[in-house]
Amino acid sequence: MPPKGNKHPIAQRQSQQKLQKQWDEEETWDDSQAEEVSDEEAEEQMESWDSLDEEDLEDVEEETIASDKAPSFKKPVRSQPPKTIPPLPPQPCSLKASRRWDTVSIAGSPTAPAAPTKRLEKTPRVRKTSSAIATRQDSPATQELRKRIFPTLYAIFQQSRGQQLELKVKNRSLRSLTRSCLYHRSEDQLQRTLEDAEALFNKYCSVSLKD
């Protein structure tokens, strides 16, 4: 049997070994806990970095969109000098300028087209029958009276040339007697014209013929 004095150092060694094991276990546990904590912190840090990267990307996208929407200031364009238009060749104009309200152009507005004008239909005038037509429609008696009146009036006209006085008889002049001879067609009117023509001839021309 071993001596009793040796029991105490053995027990002390065993107790020291147990304590050493406990310390080792605690250290390993602490190391594992620390590793777990460090792993969690690393994951959180990575997540925070990822979130920061996403936020940065969103901010960059918003900035690019805002820059696209911002109005772009264009450089002022230099004003070019007005081009000179060559004068048009003169066009032949009418002899008389138009003064109608629908053709005269107002300043700054184009010339208005002329409105179609309706020509007024002229009523046919009643033409006076000439002496030739009147003689065709005369009876033989009226034609005979005209043949007697006209030579008398012609003789009065020849004798009165150069005289300033107007020849009149019964308020009838040589001109009125000539018109009656040419245009009257009734026998009574022509008979009175013949009598007045002979009276006018006797009044002014018979004396000169006798001389």
Swiss-Prot record:
Induction entry: Expressed in the late phase of the viral replicative cycle.
Chain segments carrying region Necessary for nuclear subcellular location: 154-181
PTM section of the record: Phosphorylated in vitro by human PKA and PRKDC. PRKDC inhibits, whereas PKA activates the splicing factor.
Pro residues biased stretches: 83-92
Biased composition (Acidic residues): 24-65
Leader peptide range in chain numbering: none
Family statement drawn from the similarity comment of this UniProt entry: Belongs to the adenoviridae splicing factor family.
Protein name: Protein 33K
